[in-house]
Amino acid sequence: MSKPLIISFASKGRDNYLEASENVYLSVKDHWQYDYLFYTMDGNRNEFAGMKLTQITELPQPSTWTCNPHSVTPYQFKFGLIDHAREMGYDKIIWLDSSITLNKCPLKLLEQSNKGVMCFHNLGFETKDYISPECLAILSHKGYLQSNNPPQVWGGCIGFDFTKYSAKRIFDTIAIMSELGAFDNSPTFKNHRHDQAVMSMLFNYYDVLPYNYGHIVTNEHHENKEYGNYYTFVYGRNYRQA
């Protein structure tokens, strides 16, 4: 039997992600009937609105590789937490950043994805403007560079259906690229988008088809319904005021 999971992580960080994540918790409570893992660091609560929060002081680690803290390898923690959850037996895993809320259950969207990878076109942003030369060199050396400007995908909302071999292979490649330095900050290129840039390149290589904008929308388009009302995710929504 399938074991779906939504996973998220929050800390005080650059902004107060602990507070922003309350919107995530409320939307998951309303639109998700399966398991969830809400990790928090440097917070002081074990629950919010009846939703369990898992307090940690250091990142849970997958058994086959070491996940560095964000200060060492930016955003690698997302994939470490996903892989750790995979080892716990979860096989359909959706990652939500603290800026993303649900508008309806996303499981079907993940299950219908062409390679077992649910991702979304980040409309209006081009990958070539947000990827460092060091990252391009790593991807090229490993043979994953098919285009310098494939469609950019959202980094804050991603899903992997590990019941499909293609999703396992793609996820493992992302993790390997993070270990090789493709996520790292560049000393000369300040706009590198770390995991988002790497995923955009690898998804293009593996023929992953991103869902069009409209399956995920910004809060502005949630309010004015310019892209209709069939969307599953909303970026930047204050769910508490919905």
What are these regions (language model features)?
Residues M1-S2, S8, L18, L102, ...:
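A glycosyltransferase accessory/donor-loop signature
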Residues M1-C67, T73, E87-D91, K190-R193, ...:
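N-terminal anchoring/stem segment of glycosyltransferases
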Residues Y75-G80, I131-L145:
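Short acidic (Asp/Glu) patches
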Residues T54-T66, A137, A175-N185:
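Short amphipathic alpha-helical segments and their helix-coil junctions
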Residues N16, R45-F48, T64-C67, L102-C105, ...:
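Short catalytic/ligand-binding loop motif for oxyanion handling, primarily in non-cytosolic enzymes
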Residues N23, L81, A197-M201:
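Short amphipathic alpha-helical face segments that pack within enzyme cores
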Residues K78-P133:
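GT-A fold catalytic core of metal-dependent nucleotide-sugar glycosyltransferases
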Residues L37-T40, I93-D97, L102, M118-F120, ...:
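A structural signal for short, well-ordered beta-strand segments and their strand-loop junctions
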